[in-house]
Amino acid sequence: MKVKVYNLLQEIEKEVELNPSVFCLKYRPDIIKLVIDWQLAKRMSGTHCTKTISGVSGTTKKPFKQKGTGNARQGSLRSVQMRGGGISHGPVVRSHEFDVPKKIRKQALKYALSYKLSVNKLIVVDDFNIGSNKTAVLKNLLKKYNYSNYSGFFCIDDQNVDRNFFLASRNLFNLNVVAQIGANPYDIMKHDCVMVTLSAAKSLEMRLAE
């Protein structure tokens, strides 16, 4: 399929052919969600923990005699129903990770890229060379693509991200810049618009079409 390649001034430079097996697939939200859940699960530290009756500090003495007080019988001040007692069925330290096959992870990335292209939210530019590391310069250029604090931009460069572009982008809210090897479904779907250089698009083609 043919797509237009722009420069950062939003001028059309040329048209290129992109592999439809990477950029023109049917939308599969189920697979995209599976991989996003996998990404977020790997981020969780899993250090949440509560104390059971055995972990609570305190006496093991019976609080009062079994019969004759008129109260409900109690065996321990550390029981779950007592104030300051243990927690029943609370969270424990564990890993939230689960396995997703590499093939499915690659498919999810292709589906995410295809979806953004289908809704005209994937922009291919010739390069990210802005000639300056000033944030104001980059912000004025991106305004031509309707960038604002409320519309996130996810920029994908080839192996080596342009240094000036990277430095200028650091102070911009809701704008992330990565090399193409770091492209992932979560960031693509999270941001409103995806901007990818032509060389990065070709590298993604080679990596994902295998």
Curated annotation (Swiss-Prot):
The UniProt entry's GO CC annotations, sorted and at most eight, read:
ribonucleoprotein complex; ribosome
Output the superkingdom of the source species.
Bacteria
* Assigned keywords, A-Z: Ribonucleoprotein, Ribosomal protein, RNA-binding, rRNA-binding
| One example of a Gene Ontology biological process annotation | translation
Position of the signal peptide: none
GO MF, one annotated term: rRNA binding
> What does the UniProt record say this protein does?
One of the primary rRNA binding proteins, this protein initially binds near the 5'-end of the 23S rRNA. It is important during the early stages of 50S assembly. It makes multiple contacts with different domains of the 23S rRNA in the assembled 50S subunit and ribosome.
According to the record's subunit comment, the protein's assembly and interactions are:
Part of the 50S ribosomal subunit.
PANTHER family the record matches: 50S RIBOSOMAL PROTEIN L4, LARGE RIBOSOMAL SUBUNIT PROTEIN UL4M
UniProt record similarity statement: Belongs to the universal ribosomal protein uL4 family.
Annotated NCBIfam families: rplD_bact
Its recorded name reads Large ribosomal subunit protein uL4
Species of origin reads Orientia tsutsugamushi (strain Boryong) (Rickettsia tsutsugamushi)
Q: What is the lineage of its organism?
A: Bacteria, Pseudomonadati, Pseudomonadota, Alphaproteobacteria, Rickettsiales
